[in-house]
C-alpha cells in the first residue's frame, strides 16, 4: 500500500511516498528514477537545478567516506559503525556523550578524529585521567600521524622538566594543532590554557575529570563560552529546578540562546564507561551544548509528541495502528502490568493486526519477526529498564509509539517501599510537606549516595528488604533511608497531607482501596518514545509519540516536566 507524507521529502521538504523514503530517494518531482546512489541523485539534482537539502546529505556522505579512508590509513582497520556515527555527530557540530565500556574504540576514535580535524585547521584538546595515558596516547597518535602524513604540531604534557617546560611554552603561545594533557594539568595550569580556543575537546573518562566542578567551567571557557553566558545558564538551571515560573524560564531560555548565538563555540565529546555523572553544574552542558554528559542519549530529538483523552483504549489503539501501519510500539504503565499488555495484543490479533506482547521471558525470535515486518506492533510495559523500552535497537523499523496510559510511578499508602530509588522519589515528593529534620535527612542521604558505588547501594537495598544491619557508613545510610521511608509512610496516611497533595497541580491521587499517589515517569517516557527517532547521514528521522491520557492531572504534570526539558506536548484529535 502506497502512503504519501507531506513536508518530508529529503530534498525539497515536499510530498513523498513511503516507497521512495524506504529506498532513500527524494520525491518523484525532484528525481524521477526508482533507484540511485546518494552521489547519482546529487549529480542529477545539480544538473537539473533542483538541488536543495540533498546537498547536506551528499556532503555528509562524502565526509564520512573521506573519514573512513583516513581512519583505515591511520589504523589499518575500517572504523566500526559506532565510530562512523560518532564522526557524523562531530561533523554536524553536535556535542555528545559516548557511554561504552573499555575496549570499544573510544580512544582510537579520539586520536584519529583529532588528526582528521587537525589537518583541516581545527584545534583539538584531548583530556585523559593520568599522565601515563598522556604518554601512551602521544606515542600512539604519532604512529597514526606518520601514516596519514600529519605535519602539524602535537603537544603532550609529560616527561622530564625540560620536556614539560617546552610543552608549557608551546601551550602558552597556542603553537600547536593537537594538545594532550591530564585532567590534573587542566586544573593546575588553566592560566596557560585560558587564552586558547578549541574547536573540539575530547574528555576521556569524563567521570574523573568532572569530579571537580570547576573543570566544567574551564572546559566551557575553552570551547568559547564567556563567564556571562555560563552564569546565565546556571541561573536558568536553578530556576528550572524550582519549577515556579514557566514564563520567566521561557524568557531566560531566549536570552541564553541569543548569548550563545553570538559566541564562537566548539564541541565537547565526553567519553564515559559508566555514565554516572552527578551534580548541578554538569547540567550546564545541557543548556549550553544541547546534551547531558552521561545521559542515555543526547537531547537532540525529532519527535512529535501528541496526547488525546483515553476513552475506549483498545478501540483507539486499533484505529491508530490501522492508520499508521507497521513499525509500532505500544506501551502500558507498570501498574497496568503484563496482563494488560497481553490483553491488548490479543485484541489487536483478533482484529487482524499482527501483534505480540513482548517482555522479559518472551522469545527473542519475536524481535526478528518484528524486524522482518512479520509483526506490525509489539506491546509491552513502560518500565525504564524494560525490554521494550531499552532492549530494542531497530531504528529502521520503529516509526511510532502509542502509550495506553501515562507512564508513572504509583505509591500506595498501604505498604512501605523497599527500593531505594522509589523511597527517595516519594520522600522528595513529600518534602514540601515535611519538617526541617526530614528535609535535612533527605539532603544528607542524597550526598551520601553520591559517595557510594552501585554495588554498595545494592547491599544497602538488600539489607533494607531483609531487615539486616550493616557496618559503618553503609549502616548510617541504611538508617537514613529507613527513616525517610517510615516518615514518608506516615505523611501519606495523614488526612491533612492528603488534602494538600490533592491541591498540588503536579501530583495525582487515587482514592479507592486506600490512597495511591501517582507521579509521571518522565525518564521512561523520553526513553520509550525515543525509540521512534534515529540519526542518519542526512539528519535525524522524525518519530511520532501518542499518549492516550487516562489522568488529566498526571498529564499536566508530565507536560510541565517535559516543558522544562524543552519538549512540547501537543493536543491531538479526539476523534
From Swiss-Prot:
Which reaction is the catalytic activity of this chain? Answer: ATP + H2O = ADP + phosphate + H(+)
Sorted alphabetically, the Gene Ontology cellular component annotations on this record are: cytoplasm
SUPFAM superfamilies per record: P-loop containing nucleoside triphosphate hydrolases
Its localization reads: Cytoplasm
The stretches annotated as zinc fingers (RG N-terminal-type) lie at 1-39
Q: What is its main location?
A: cytoplasm
User: InterPro entries under this entry?
Assistant: DEAD/DEAH_box_helicase_dom (IPR011545), Helicase_ATP-bd (IPR014001), P-loop_NTPase (IPR027417), Reverse_gyrase (IPR005736), Znf_Rg (IPR040569)
EC number, as in UniProt: 5.6.2.-
State the Gene3D superfamilies in the record. Answer: P-loop containing nucleotide triphosphate hydrolases
Alphabetically sorted, this entry's keywords are: ATP-binding, Cytoplasm, Isomerase, Metal-binding, Nucleotide-binding
GO biological process per UniProt = DNA topological change
One MF term in the entry's GO annotations? DNA binding
Q: Which CDD domains match?
A: DDXDc_reverse_gyrase (cd17924), SF2_C_reverse_gyrase (cd18798)
Name the residues that bind ATP: 83, 100-107
Family as reported in the entry's similarity comment: Belongs to the DEAD box helicase family. DDVD subfamily.
Further facts: This enzyme is the only unique feature of hyperthermophilic bacteria/archaea known and seems to be essential for adaptation to life at high temperatures. It may play a role in stabilization of DNA at high temperatures.
Q: Domain remarks in the entry?
A: Introduction of positive supercoils requires the cooperation of both the helicase-like and topoisomerase domains of the 2 subunits. The helicase-like domain probably does not directly unwind DNA, but more likely acts by driving ATP-dependent conformational changes within the whole enzyme.
Query: What does the subunit section of this Swiss-Prot or TrEMBL entry state?
Result: Heterodimer of an RgyA and RgyB subunit.
| Name under which the protein is recorded | Reverse gyrse subunit B
Gene name of this polypeptide: rgyB
Amino acid at each position: 500500500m502506497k502512503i504519501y507524507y507531506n513536508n518530508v521529502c529529503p530534498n525539497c521538504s515536499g510530498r513523498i511516498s513511503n516507497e521512495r523514503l524506504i529506498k532513500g530517494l527524494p520525491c518523484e518531482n525532484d528525481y524521477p528514477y526508482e533507484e540511485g546512489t546518494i552521489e547519482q541523485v546529487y549529480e542529477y539534482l545539480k544538473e537539473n537545478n533542483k538541488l536543495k537539502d540533498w546537498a547536506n546529505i551528499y556532503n555528509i556522505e562524502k565526509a564520512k567516506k573521506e573519514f573512513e579512508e583516513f581512519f583505515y590509513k591511520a589504523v589499518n582497520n575500517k572504523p566500526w559503525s559506532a565510530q562512523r556515527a560518532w564522526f557524523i555527530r562531530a561533523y554536524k557540530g553536535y556535542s555528545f556523550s559516548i557511554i561504552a565500556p573499555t575496549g570499544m574504540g573510544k580512544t582510537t576514535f579520539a586520536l584519529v578524529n583529532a588528526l582528521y580535524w587537525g589537518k583541516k585547521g581545527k584545534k583539538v584538546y584531548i583530556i585523559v585521567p593520568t599522565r601515563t595515558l598522556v604518554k601512551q596516547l602521544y606515542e600512539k597518535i604519532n604512529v597514526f600521524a606518520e601514516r596519514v602524513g600529519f605535519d602539524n604540531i602535537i603537544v603532550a604534557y609529560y616527561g622530564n622538566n625540560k620536556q614539560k617546560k617546552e610543552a608549557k611554552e608551546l601551550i602558552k603561545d597556542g603553537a600547536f594543532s593537537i594538545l594532550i594533557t591530564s585532567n590534573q594539568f587542566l586544573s593546575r595550569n588553566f592560566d596557560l590554557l585560558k587564552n586558547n580556543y578549541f574547536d573540539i575537546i575530547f574528555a576521556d573518562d569524563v567521570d574523573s575529570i568532572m569530579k571537580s566542578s570547576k573543570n566544567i567551567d574551564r572546559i566551557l571557557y575553552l570551547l568559547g563560552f564567556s563567564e556571562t553566558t555560563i552564569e546565565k545558564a546556571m541561573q536558568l538551571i536553578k530556576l528550572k529546578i524550582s519549577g515556579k515560573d514557566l514564563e520567566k524560564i521561557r524568557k531566560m531560555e531566549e536570552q541564553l540562546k541569543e548569548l550563545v548565538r553570538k559566541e564562537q563555540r566548539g564541541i565537547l565529546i565526553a567519553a564515559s564507561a559508566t555514565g554516572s555523572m552527578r551534580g548541578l553544574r554538569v547540567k550546564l552542558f545541557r543548556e549550553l551544548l544541547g546534551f547531558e554528559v552521561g545521559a542515555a542519549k543526547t537531547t537532540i530529538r525529532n519527535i512529535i509528541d501528541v496526547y488525546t483523552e483515553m476513552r475506549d483504549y483498545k478501540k483507539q489503539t486499533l484505529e491508530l495502528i490501522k492508520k499508521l501501519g507497521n513499525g509500532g510500539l505500544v506501551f502500558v504503565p507498570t501498574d497496568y502490568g503484563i496482563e494488560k499488555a497481553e490483553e491488548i495484543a490479543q485484541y489487536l490479533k483478533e482484529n487482524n493486526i499482527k501483534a505480540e506482547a513482548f517482555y522479559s521471558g518472551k522469545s527473542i525470535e519475536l524481535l526478528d519477526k518484528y524486524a522482518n515486518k512479520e509483526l506490525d506492533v509489539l506491546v509491552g510495559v513502560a518500565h525504564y529498564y524494560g525490554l521494550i523500552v531499552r532492549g530494542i535497537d531497530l531504528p529502521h523499523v520503529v516509526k511510532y509509539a502509542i502509550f495506553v496510559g501515562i507512564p508513572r510511578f504509583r505509591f500506595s499508602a498501604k505498604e512501605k517501599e523497599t527500593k531505594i530509588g522509589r523511597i527517595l522519589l516519594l520522600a522528595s515528593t513529600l518534602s514540601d510537606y515535611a519538617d526541617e529534620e526530614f528535609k535535612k535527612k533527605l539532603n544528607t542521604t542524597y550526598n551520601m549516595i553520591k559517595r557510594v558505588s552501585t554495588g554498595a547501594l545494592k547491599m544497602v537495598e538488600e539489607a533494607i528488604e531483609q531487615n539486616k544491619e550493616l557496618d559503618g557508613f553503609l549502616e548510617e545510610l541504611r538508617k537514613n533511608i529507613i527513616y525517610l521511608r517510615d516518615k514518608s509512610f506516615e505523611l501519606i496516611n495523614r488526612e491533612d497531607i492528603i488534602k494538600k497533595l490533592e491541591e498540588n497541580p503536579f501530583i495525582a491521587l487515587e482514592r479507592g482501596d486506600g490512597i495511591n499517589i501517582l507521579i509521571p515517569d518522565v525518564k521512561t517516557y523520553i526513553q520509550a518514545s525515543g525509540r521512534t527517532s534515529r540519526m542518519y547521514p542526512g539528519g535525524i528521522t522524525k518519530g511520532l509519540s501518542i499518549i492516550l491520557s487516562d489522568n488529566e492531572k498526571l498529564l499536566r504534570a508530565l507536560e510541565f516536566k517535559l516543558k522544562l526539558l524543552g519538549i512540547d506536548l501537543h493536543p491531538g484529535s479526539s476523534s
